[in-house]
Amino acid sequence: MISSNDFRTGTTIELDGQVWRVVEFLHVKPGKGSAFVRTKLKSVQNGNVVEKTFRAGESVQQAILEKSNLQHTYVESGDYVFMDMTSFEETRLSSEQIGKGAKYLKEGMEVNVIFHNGKVLEVELPISITLKVTETDPGVKGDTASGGTKPAILETGAQVMVPLFISVGEMIRVDTRNDSYLGREN
């Protein structure tokens, strides 16, 4: 159990049979009446965001999460196979369980998988990854860094918008949170 006074950004709690992560919290102490904690909670399972108010000092069930560092080894019949780097056990996850990050997975990539009661809740990819551009429109002389953008398809099949000067075969860094181009990789 955790007190609502101990909420911090990132704290995970169990509420109504779901696991929620505290995104924002604010301790409010009105002049009249008792203090309370106003929170914004995000469901770890489906990403829904709700606002909920707790009485100050109210006890809430804290969610116990296990984080494992797994390495993506291969894809078999639509399932992504991961190997635990310490116990060498294999874990199979569907693209629905992985979420939008599935388009960035390549063999040998390490990810953090978060479990709750033996079930996969979330797959955390590295914030930025380096991938090779396999398909894009050719660059034209005079394209500059401050100009426009064009679509590019990466080695994993993901599509991102890149500057006009990027060409096929280049290695680029991509932000996996918002699918944005971060820069060239040397």
Swiss-Prot record:
Keyword Cytoplasm: yes
Subcellular location: Cytoplasm
GO term, biological process aspect, one: peptide biosynthetic process
Transmembrane segments: none
PROSITE patterns, alphabetized: EFP (PS01275)
Main location: cytoplasm
Record pathway: Protein biosynthesis; polypeptide chain elongation
Domain of life: Bacteria
Keywords: Cytoplasm, Elongation factor, Protein biosynthesis
Alphabetized SUPFAM superfamilies for the sequence: Nucleic acid-binding proteins, Translation proteins SH3-like domain
Annotated GO CC locations: cytoplasm
InterPro entries on file: Elong-fact-P_C, NA-bd_OB-fold, Rib_uL2_dom2, Transl_elong_fac_P/YeiP, Transl_elong_KOW-like, Transl_elong_P/YeiP_cen, Transl_elong_P/YeiP_CS, Transl_elongation_fac_P
NCBIfam families to which the protein is assigned, alphabetical: efp, PRK00529.1
Function: Involved in peptide bond synthesis. Stimulates efficient translation and peptide-bond synthesis on native or reconstituted 70S ribosomes in vitro. Probably functions indirectly by altering the affinity of the ribosome for aminoacyl-tRNA, thus increasing their reactivity as acceptors for peptidyl transferase.
Family listed: Belongs to the elongation factor P family.
Listed PANTHER family: ELONGATION FACTOR P, ELONGATION FACTOR P (EF-P) FAMILY PROTEIN
Listed HAMAP family: EF_P (MF_00141)
Protein name as annotated: Elongation factor P
